[in-house]
């Protein structure tokens, strides 16, 4: 009986990647950097002007996220990097989201934050960013030009591009979202 239990436990643990072998810090960092590059590529595909916005900004953050909603509750997680364009300093970050309201579904989405000032980037990296249930935004092009076309202005000097599949989301409807440093990868 003990042998059968041991065989079943080994079989189950080997079928779960996180249990079977923990990735090294370097491997985990590489996976997060790849996910961030995928997020940038997805945004550039649907909003080509975002490339200039990212490259000319003080810094940016790129996240690849996964969310799920079942009946009245939902949530999501994600990982990404924040990069200071001047120093090329990279900070590994995480995202967690909690939602309430009716719904059902699973989605994968990419977020690219653009920070016009080093102060805005520093605040994001060192204090995180929380978005409450009332957070909404609209694309503002007026004085800022076409570089931010398709982005949501969250605060002065902070823009957000959100891509789900191959389409650009022009409205942010995040609820209870927190961004914070990844203590294991930094």
Question: What do the PLM-derived regions correspond to, one by one?
Answer:
Residues 11-15:
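Bacterial N-terminal signal peptides
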């Amino acid at each position: 009986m003990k042998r059968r239990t041991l065989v079943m436990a080994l079989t189950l643990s080997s079928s779960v990647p996180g249990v079977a072998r923990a990735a090294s810090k370097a491997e985990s960092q590489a996976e997060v950097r790849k996910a961030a590059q995928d997020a940038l590529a997805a945004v550039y595909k649907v909003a080509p002007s975002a490339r200039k916005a990212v490259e000319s900004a003080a810094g940016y953050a790129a996240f690849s996220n996964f969310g799920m909603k079942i009946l009245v509750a939902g949530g999501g997680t994600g990982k990404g990097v924040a990069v200071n364009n001047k120093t090329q300093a990279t900070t590994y970050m995480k995202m967690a989201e909690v939602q309430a309201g009716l719904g059902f579904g699973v989605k994968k989405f990419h977020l690219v934050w653009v920070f016009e000032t080093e102060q805005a980037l520093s605040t994001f990296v060192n204090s995180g960013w929380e978005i409450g249930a009332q957070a909404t935004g609209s694309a503002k092009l007026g004085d800022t030009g076409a570089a931010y076309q398709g982005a949501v202005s969250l605060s002065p000097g902070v823009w957000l591009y959100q891509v789900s599949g191959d389409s650009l989301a022009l409205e942010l409807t995040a609820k209870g979202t927190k961004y914070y440093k990844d203590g294991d990868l930094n």
